[in-house]
Amino acid sequence: MEAESPCAASDLAVARRELLSGNHRELDPVGLRQTWLDLHESWLIDKADEIGIADASGFAIVGVGGLGRRELLPYSDLDVLLLHDGKPADILRPVADRLWYPLWDANIRLDHSVRTVSEALTIANSDLMAALGMLEARHIAGDQQLSFALIDGVRRQWRNGIRSRMGELVEMTYARWRRCGRIAQRAEPDLKLGRGGLRDVQLLDALALAQLIDRHGIGHTDLPAGSLDGAYRTLLDVRTELHRVSGRGRDHLLAQFADEISAALGFGDRFDLARTLSSAGRTIGYHAEAGLRTAANALPRRGISALVRRPKRRPLDEGVVEYAGEIVLARDAEPEHDPGLVLRVAAASADTGLPIGAATLSRLAASVPDLPTPWPQEALDDLLVVLSAGPTTVATIEALDRTGLWGRLLPEWEPIRDLPPRDVAHKWTVDRHVVETAVHAAPLATRVARPDLLALGALLHDIGKGRGTDHSVLGAELVIPVCTRLGLSPPDVRTLSKLVRHHLLLPITATRRDLNDPKTIEAVSEALGGDPQLLEVLHALSEADSKATGPGVWSDWKASLVDDLVRRCRMVMAGESLPQAEPTAPHYLSLAADHGVHVEISPRDGERIDAVIVAPDERGLVSKAAAVLALNSLRVHSASVNVHQGVAITEFVVSPLFGSPPAAELVRQQFVGALNGDVDVLGMLQKRDSDAASLVSARAGDVQAGVPVTRTAAPPRILWLDTAAPAKLILEVRAMDRAGLLALLAGALEGAGAGIVWAKVNTFGSTAADVFCVTVPAELDARAAVEQHLLEVLGASVDVVVDEPVGD
């Protein structure tokens, strides 16, 4: 019997078992990995010396995978490549056998291959996974020239070929993310392959080797959420402990091991571990997504594409542009002096579905001052746009949160950030849940009279969690200073406080109490102070909250019970007052006295402007006035229309999309031309919108693959309200706001033969709620004609067209 080799793998196996025994628990994960690496690397070096694998021998041992990265974990495969310079089989086979067989005999998991440098490069050129693995190759023993030829060759080949392989790399990454899910939102996450896992950092390393991203720069950037390298070390340490605790090469962190791993790493309990993993996974996931975009935009341009003009910068808001499929700062932006810029950038991202550029986020985080208290109305409106955008809200808030900007806007966010749910019915961490609630509330925006309160209620309804007390009670207290800081009026602050306090009231009562008992209905109505508007918003919030909790939480059965409860409560609450015309200032009444055309433009507090147009009333006046403002790139935030002694007084609160507002005399000239029929301002507005839509469609190909452009539009609603005067009706149109919407709605009413007696217009973030008091022709189908004209403007089938009598 042949004597055992001096470098027998049985000794290695004994040393491995000893290292993993309870005698070495003092080794932390870093120490365990280093000791484990030294153990195996020393064995390979000694074995190489024994079997003649030396410098200039024509053989080399190269480590790949964890061995190549110096991150060898217990129970992971030993990834080894035996390189040779073209040795014949009779020389090659004995050397390979003497290297592999001792490891096999010792039951050490081995992932091995035998290649020449040319063969290895050929495989790396055809197999993307093999290429990524070889990018991590490291010389262990033997002929250094062979190892360096492989390492240099595979990296040069990777750099030269990245342009043709980028599409496959992106597709493979997104397929893995879909298959393995996010680390941050999985009860048993895949630490290696999950979205935000270890493999994503290795992806970034590969992009850096292709010279497409600055890996060192992003790795050491210490954001409030933690650095990329710190997040990677966290996951690596947890995975190391998972191997040690489970005794297997696991990548999925099963719940049964969580408490022991938490104790070993000093995290407290499994909930603390889950919170730490969520933060690390989100940090890595953010950098991975940003890295893919940065790399795609940095790809070298060749052939015909090199002759094509670079993408244009498309203005979106003051200081904000779209460039190459990302939201970035305009060249003349001054973030150091513009505290509202963060939310304008965020609103543009949420509204378009385009991601915010990583460099833009870094610059904003480093230089933008905090918003004043209370917030300007413009900042609150931009926040509402973010919250009302639908699915794109998630990525926008995530980008702000990972870079510390969201926490500066809402310091109260910290206790719920990455907070794991205590209830198994919950799918998301608490912070993600409230964002998902806003996503589910967005399609319900036109179902309520105050979509702004719905959006803010969705964001803040669980703000009291994570503090060891009744989150509804504490949350109701917390939202008072929050909403005051945001600039809400005292009545709205009180309403939101009640909304948070009672956000569980409707579903709990509907599913646990007898709805036929009058005392049940009285108790709910009394808790809500008899406020039908609060009930309406709470109804929508209850639905959004349940849908955001998890699959099946909002069922048809539950919806029917809540609907029944709300119906019964409305019956016992006081009726809502009819909308009324806004009073007109005496100054404008005096202007109306001479029956001329007057235009006044004057600044308000902040960025907003009063634009008042006074002219003799005639059909089409309101639509033409609003169209002139829209054509001058003025965004209408609110408006009122009144007719006094045959003269229409239209008061608008507007803000310029870019730059300074137009001069009043210019607006007057354009308006007079529209009244005289010299200029078709409505036609110009419709053509501008059509051209803009075509431009967006044509540029869709510029958006990088894997960046979804998905926006949620709440279905429009038309509500008819009967008045005491039979000849007049009040009509409310709720729809997603867009440039020129007021002009188009007024034009539709006028085109249907309706006369506008007065109007009151409000925009809540991205949702418009426009009330018109109109006279309609006496024909039986007059309402239907009005609705049809409005439908054509709204561009969608109306969700609900209702007669809703409201009394005093």
Curated annotation (Swiss-Prot):
Activity control mechanisms: Uridylyltransferase (UTase) activity is inhibited by glutamine, while glutamine activates uridylyl-removing (UR) activity.
Pfam families: GlnD_UR_UTase, HD
Catalytic activity: [protein-PII]-L-tyrosine + UTP = [protein-PII]-uridylyl-L-tyrosine + diphosphate; [protein-PII]-uridylyl-L-tyrosine + H2O = [protein-PII]-L-tyrosine + UMP + H(+)
Segments for region (Uridylyl-removing): 316-609
All copies of domain HD, residue ranges: 430-544
Database matches in InterPro entries: ACT-like_dom_sf, ACT_dom, HD/PDEase_dom, HD_domain, NT_sf, PII_UdlTrfase/GS_AdlTrfase, UTase/UR
Domain ACT: 610-686, 730-805
Key words, A-Z: Hydrolase, Magnesium, Multifunctional enzyme, Nucleotidyltransferase, Repeat, Transferase
Region (Uridylyltransferase): 1-315
Cofactor names: Mg(2+)
Keyword Repeat among UniProt keywords: yes
MF GO annotations: [protein-PII] uridylyltransferase activity; adenylyltransferase activity; phosphoric diester hydrolase activity
HAMAP family xrefs: PII_uridylyl_transf (MF_00277)
Role of this protein: Modifies, by uridylylation and deuridylylation, the PII regulatory protein (GlnB), in response to the nitrogen status of the cell that GlnD senses through the glutamine level. Under low glutamine levels, catalyzes the conversion of the PII protein and UTP to PII-UMP and PPi, while under higher glutamine levels, GlnD hydrolyzes PII-UMP to PII and UMP (deuridylylation). Thus, controls uridylylation state and activity of the PII protein, and plays an important role in the regulation of nitrogen assimilation and metabolism.
NCBIfam families named among the record's database cross-references: PRK03381.1, UTase_glnD
Family of this protein: Belongs to the GlnD family.
Protein name (database record): Bifunctional uridylyltransferase/uridylyl-removing enzyme
